[in-house]
Structure formats: structure tokens, C-alpha cells
């Protein structure tokens, strides 16, 4: 990446020892300033011919950030990523008492309060774990630090598949012995014990913030299913409350027990990953079908009371875990029944059909109907559609898709946003049905190298700066504009504003904080910025 400098006058050569010392000191200060301005270690860029670059990491080098500190009162920090190659680069500025520029004005409205944030993260699938563990210990450590440490983007959510999914290299459940209704042969295989669990522990040790785990099942054991297969059209045999449904509910408790024995405890479970998938003939990978009515009765009679009467009564239960296109209908069916509703903490949504389902008509309407049931984005990835290339190393647009989705979700009351695989190989796998997709980190095992994509940094513009407990507040625009913007107040009282410019035009703008004054800035074309300042 070439860095251009502004034109400048030549400085006269310093004379004598004092001059040399002054020049040396100035050089050191400039170097230090450059280090401060670009994080602890800058991106090592590489282009693969797409719209932007990846940052290359290996056993000896990886770009990193400084631990986050609040700027001095009356000043702000600005973190910038651009299509041209900047990656979360820090600069500082000062609030002004008066506004001097024209154009767009964004006014912080701290008294207009909305949802509190749970957090941001990704999924520790079998595929992700296999790729991460294939790296040398040094490179692996840097990858996990990039996601979870203060030097990285500080994820605080990890999704854990319950047994196999498409991003596994074999098909298995935790209870494959037929007719084992007491689940006496339930056990965690090597995928959990040797892959996922050690990596999750390593991530938790690195994190300065508490990390919340949530789990989702793809399929039950085949002997509990109507079609006797992990995939295709099939549901649980029988009806809610019977031994098939009760056994499946007990399976959740057994899973939580097994992970607790490894000292891992869960914040939440989802009732089923994409329950609509198992209603389709020929569905290619692990699934278990539920209609909304079936899920309603299942929650009310099986996992709801089973979890409530177990040692895991504090584990939250999330319904849906499927496309938001199914809202508000699914919520209306499930939550209309008080017996089901009392067990449901939240509604999990996936992003894959968002282009068919406007946020206002789905998320907005669901929040209007059920304001006390939280909305949570539980899965997203790019490259899954049949017309999309699986992996596009360095694609800026794919990062933009992430940040645009996160801002839209935040504006419509969603409390968290979860990416899919934490890491994949250059093909977008492994995946046993070859359902290859993209990931914010791509691992090239042959070179003991991993690539941090624009998606990684777009996510980081939220995850690093918006800790759990932050609350979205109002941000009023003086005129119609093409920027995506959102504002939040952190638990420490500081303010965060994220500005995404998806357009080809630079946009001059001013952010007004009624308590401090005016922050005058520019949102360059194809850029994302996070602004942070102290309000107390």
C-alpha cells in the first residue's frame, strides 16, 4: 500500500549537536505519532484483485490495535477504514463551540433512548475450529487475539453448533444410538472436546470483557425424526409433550451439562437453527422442521419447562433463529400463547433473505407488537447465494454489506449481531455438502497464514467500541442523506457514533453533542468511521 504525504516546504538542515538532537527527537515523536495513529501494528496489505485489500497475518506478524482509551474531555477519537486500504486508523480532533461549516448536521439526542446492546461475535463451527487449529500455535494465538483481545476487535459473543452442521466434515449427533430415550449414550465427540472447547477457552482467557456463549441445534438424532435422516423434509416424531419431544428437550440439558463439565456455561440456546428448512423436500444438510405452531407447543411443553426445572434455568431460550421474512407471523403465533411466551427471552433472526423483507415491516413491526421480547441477529455470511462467488479476498463491498446490516438492525431494535464462521479456508470450507461461503478471516494452511478481510474491520467498527450494556440513542439528521449512521451511549458514559458512506462522494458533516459542541469532519467515499468521545 502506497502512502502519499501532503506537499510541504523543505525544512532547513539542523546545525550542530542540538540541532541533530532536536531532529532526532522530532523524528521519534513523528514515528510515535504514526504508531499511535495507525494502531499498535499496521496492516500488512495484499491485493487479490478485488475492490480492496486483506491484511496478511502469520506466526510472526499481525496488525493490531491499541487497547481502547477514552480521549481527553472536549476531544474525540476517530477510527477510519476505507476501500483504499486504511484499517481502523486513529486520529484525534477537538469539539468546537460554534459550527463553521455547512452541510449535513447530525445531532445526538441522548434523552431519546432505545434498546441496550448484548454484543457482537461469530460462530465456532467445526470448520472454523479445524482451520484455526491447523495454524501454528503462534499464528493461532494471533488469530484469536485479533477477534477477542484488547489488541483486536473484542468480540463478546460465540455461537456454538450443537453437534454437526453443514460446516462439519462428517455427520454426527451426540446421541446416535437408536431408541436411547434416556440418552444414556449421550457424549461429546472429538469435535467438541479437542477442537471447539479448547479454542473457546483460549478465547475467553484473552478477552477483557465477559463473553456470552449461545448454542443452536441443526438436527436431532435420526431415530427421533419422521424421515429417519439428518437432512431433507422431516420433523420430530409424535407431538409436543410425548417421549420424542421430551427426549429432544433433555438433549439440550445434556449438552449444557456436558459443556459445564468442561467449565463452559451458556447465556442462551435457540430452539432450532432455521426450523423452516426441515419443511422442504430435498433440503441438503442437517435440519429439523417446525411450523410456528409446532415450535409454540414444543417450547411450552418441552424445552421451556425442562430447562426451567434443570440446573440451567438461567439459560435464555431464543425462538425462530431463522429469516426475518418469517416475522412478525412466527412471533404472533408463538408469543400469543402465554405458556410458550413465558419461556421465550428473545427472537433470533438470520439475514439471508433480508433483501425480500424490509426491516420496518419485520423487525419494526415485531418490536411494536412485542416490545419486551428482544431481537437478536444470530447468523450472517456472504457468498451463500447460488449466484455469488464463495470467497472474494479483499472485497470491500462484502464488508459494507455487514456494516449496513448491523446499522439497520440496530436502528430497528436488534440487540446483537452474530457472524457465521469465525474462519474458513480459501475455498470457503470445509463443508460436507460443499456449501462454501466467505468469512472475515480466511486461513491458508499451506502458508501458515491468515487473511483479515474488510468484513473483519467493518464488524470491528462496532464490536470494539460498543460493549455490552451500551444503549442506542437518537441521532437526528438535518437533511436527507446517503449515509448510514447510528449513535449509542456506552456504560462508561461516553458516546459512539458510527458513520458508513457507501457512496462515491465525500460527505462533509458535523456531529453536534448538545453537551459539548460541534465535531466537524468529512465522511470520505467508500469509508466507515467510528467516533468516540467522553460526555461526563
From Swiss-Prot:
Protein's name according to its UniProt entry: Lysosomal acid glucosylceramidase
Pfam families, A to Z: Glyco_hydro_30 (PF02055), Glyco_hydro_30C (PF17189)
Keyword NADP: no
Disulfide cysteine pairs (residue numbers): 43-55, 57-62
SUPFAM superfamilies in the cross-refs: (Trans)glycosidases, Glycosyl hydrolase domain
Mode of membrane association: Peripheral membrane protein
Subcellular localization(s) per the UniProt record: Lysosome membrane
Free-text function comment from the UniProt entry: Glucosylceramidase that catalyzes, within the lysosomal compartment, the hydrolysis of glucosylceramides/GlcCers (such as beta-D-glucosyl-(1<->1')-N-acylsphing-4-enine) into free ceramides (such as N-acylsphing-4-enine) and glucose. Plays a central role in the degradation of complex lipids and the turnover of cellular membranes. Through the production of ceramides, participates in the PKC-activated salvage pathway of ceramide formation. Catalyzes the glucosylation of cholesterol, through a transglucosylation reaction where glucose is transferred from GlcCer to cholesterol.
Gene encoding the protein: GBA1
GO biological process, one term: cholesterol metabolic process
Amino acid at each position: 500500500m502506497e502512502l502519499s504525504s501532503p506537499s510541504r516546504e523543505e525544512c532547513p538542515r539542523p546545525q550542530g549537536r542540538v540541532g541533530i538532537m532536536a531532529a532526532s527527537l522530532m523524528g521519534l515523536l513523528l514515528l510515535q505519532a504514526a504508531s499511535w495513529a495507525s494502531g499498535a501494528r499496521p496492516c500488512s496489505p495484499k491485493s487479490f484483485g478485488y475492490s480492496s485489500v486483506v491484511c496478511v497475518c502469520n506466526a510472526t506478524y499481525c496488525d493490531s490495535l491499541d487497547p481502547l482509551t477514552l480521549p481527553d474531555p472536549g476531544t474525540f477519537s476517530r477510527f477510519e477504514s476505507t476501500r483504499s486500504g486504511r484499517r481502523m486508523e486513529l486520529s484525534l480532533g477537538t469539539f468546537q463551540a460554534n459550527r463553521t461549516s455547512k452541510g449535513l448536521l447530525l445531532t445526538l439526542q441522548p434523552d431519546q433512548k432505545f434498546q441496550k446492546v448484548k454484543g457482537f461475535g461469530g460462530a465456532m463451527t467445526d470448520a472454523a475450529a479445524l482451520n484455526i487449529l491447523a495454524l501454528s500455535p503462534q499464528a493461532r494465538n494471533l488469530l484469536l487475539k485479533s477477534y477477542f483481545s484488547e489488541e483486536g476487535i473484542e468480540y463478546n459473543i460465540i455461537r456454538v453448533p450443537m453437534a454437526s452442521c453443514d460446516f462439519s466434515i462428517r455427520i454426527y449427533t451426540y446421541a446416535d444410538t437408536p431408541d436411547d430415550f434416556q440418552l444414556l449414550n449421550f457424549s461429546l465427540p472429538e469435535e467438541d472436546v479437542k477442537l471447539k472447547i479448547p479454542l473457546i477457552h483460549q478465547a475467553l482467557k484473552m478477552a477483557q470483557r465477559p463473553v456470552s456463549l449461545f448454542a443452536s441445534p441443526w438436527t436431532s438424532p435420526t431415530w427421533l425424526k419422521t424421515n429417519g435422516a439428518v437432512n431433507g423434509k422431516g420433523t420430530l416424531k409424535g407431538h409436543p409433550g410425548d417421549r420424542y419431544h421430551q427426549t429432544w428437550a433433555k438433549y439440550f440439558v445434556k449438552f449444557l451439562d456436558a459443556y459445564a463439565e468442561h467449565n463452559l456455561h451458556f447465556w442462551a440456546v435457540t430452539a432450532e437453527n432455521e426450523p423452516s428448512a426441515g419443511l422442504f423436500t430435498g433440503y441438503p444438510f442437517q435440519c429439523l422442521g417446525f411450523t410456528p405452531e409446532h415450535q409454540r407447543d414444543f417450547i411450552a411443553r418441552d424445552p421451556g419447562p425442562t430447562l426451567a426445572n434443570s440446573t440451567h434455568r438461567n439459560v435464555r431460550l431464543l425462538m425462530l433463529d431463522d429469516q426475518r421474512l418469517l416475522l412478525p407471523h412466527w412471533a404472533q403465533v408463538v408469543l400469543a400463547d402465554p405458556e410458550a411466551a413465558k419461556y421465550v427471552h428473545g427472537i433470533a433472526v438470520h439475514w439471508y433473505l433480508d433483501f425480500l423483507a424490509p426491516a420496518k415491516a419485520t423487525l419494526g413491526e415485531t418490536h411494536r407488537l412485542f416490545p419486551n421480547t428482544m431481537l437478536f441477529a444470530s447468523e450472517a455470511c456472504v457468498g451463500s447465494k447460488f449466484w455469488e462467488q464463495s470467497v472474494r479476498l479483499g472485497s470491500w463491498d462484502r464488508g459494507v454489506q455487514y456494516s449496513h446490516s448491523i446499522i439497520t438492525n440496530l436502528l430497528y431494535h436488534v440487540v446483537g449481531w452474530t457472524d457465521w464462521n469465525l474462519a474458513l479456508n480459501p475455498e470457503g470450507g470445509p463443508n460436507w455438502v460443499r456449501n462454501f461461503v466467505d468469512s472475515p478471516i480466511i486461513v491458508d494452511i499451506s502458508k501458515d497464514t491468515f487473511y483479515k478481510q474488510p468484513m473483519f474491520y467493518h464488524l470491528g467498527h462496532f464490536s470494539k467500541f460498543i460493549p455490552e450494556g451500551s444503549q442506542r440513542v437518537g441521532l437526528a439528521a438535518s437533511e436527507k442523506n446517503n449515509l448510514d449512521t447510528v449513535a449509542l451511549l456506552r456504560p462508561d458514559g461516553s458516546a459512539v457514533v458510527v458513520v458508513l458512506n457507501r457512496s462515491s462522494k465525500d460527505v462533509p458533516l458535523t456531529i453536534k453533542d448538545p453537551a459539548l459542541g460541534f465535531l466537524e469532519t468529512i465522511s470520505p467515499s467508500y469509508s466507515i468511521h467510528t467516533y468516540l468521545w467522553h460526555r461526563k
